[in-house]
Amino acid sequence: MERLAPAKVNLGLSVRFRREDGYHELHTLFAPFSLADRLVVEPVSSGLHFQGPYGRENLAYRAASLYLEAAGQPGGVRILLEKRIPEGAGLGGGSSDAAQVLLALQALYPAEVDLFALARTLGADVPFFLLGRGAEARGVGERLKPLALPPVPAVVFFPGLRVPTPLVYRAVRPEDFGPDLPVEAILEALARGEEPPYWNSLEGPAFRLFPELKEVRGRMRALGLRGVLMSGSGSAFFGLAEGPDHARRAAEALRAWGRAWAGTLGGGDAGSGPA
């Protein structure tokens, strides 16, 4: 069984406040992006055989182990993971891989297992990737409301800098906190091809830690991309294009400074098809 594990971008991310448990309350819009890792998941008689980076420490391996245990060890599995989504980019690659493993194993070994409960133990972004579509998220990202997002041509750019998510959150200051995102206004702007009124509260701390990230927005805007924003805790940025050709030209130009992909964000189901 082959599955695609799509990347995500945050169409705005507002850090509302720091909670008593030490985590930050968030309000964000998740959108799948067409860049994807590739997974091959096959049943075997016994054991958990994983071929991919980090071995047993990989979130996809941990997801498989959790599911097989919860399902009563119905059989074994062999997993091949081909990484395309860069690490430390804020694109959710590891979380997406884990979600697709859970979905694949449920298809191979059906059982009364709460996938969302397992996903929450693996990471805050994993439940979103089970949905396979856009979503509004609150809490630390685990409280989800599905959203219908229009497909938008876009470019994702990774400058090659790995940014540890915990480091960015530790650098958040009270002045970085923001109000709820204007969800309806963002959706309307996307549908009309206009600049969405979103922001990312994590840009401030990320820019303080890594000042070189400030240059990225200017480079992308100079290529005619609109709504340029850092995704998650960085270091990847995305920008909205006028059309597929514009996206391809912009991505080609950006490859002089890092890795770039032209594709589509939002739209219909993501992650369910073959590679």
Curated annotation (Swiss-Prot):
The active site is at 8, 125. The keyword Hydrolase does not apply. It is an enzyme of class 2 (transferase). Pfam families: GHMP_kinases_C, GHMP_kinases_N. Pathway: Isoprenoid biosynthesis; isopentenyl diphosphate biosynthesis via DXP pathway; isopentenyl diphosphate from 1-deoxy-D-xylulose 5-phosphate: step 3/6. GO terms for molecular function: 4-(cytidine 5'-diphospho)-2-C-methyl-D-erythritol kinase activity; ATP binding. It catalyses: 4-CDP-2-C-methyl-D-erythritol + ATP = 4-CDP-2-C-methyl-D-erythritol 2-phosphate + ADP + H(+). Keywords: ATP-binding, Isoprene biosynthesis, Kinase, Nucleotide-binding, Transferase. Its EC number is 2.7.1.148. One of its GO terms (biological process) is terpenoid biosynthetic process. The keyword ATP-binding applies. ATP binds at residues 86-96. InterPro entries: GHMP_kinase_C_dom, GHMP_kinase_C_sf, GHMP_kinase_N_dom, IspE, Ribosomal_Su5_D2-typ_SF, Ribsml_uS5_D2-typ_fold_subgr. Catalyzes the phosphorylation of the position 2 hydroxy group of 4-diphosphocytidyl-2C-methyl-D-erythritol. Belongs to the GHMP kinase family. IspE subfamily. This is 4-diphosphocytidyl-2-C-methyl-D-erythritol kinase. It comes from Thermus thermophilus (strain ATCC 27634 / DSM 579 / HB8).
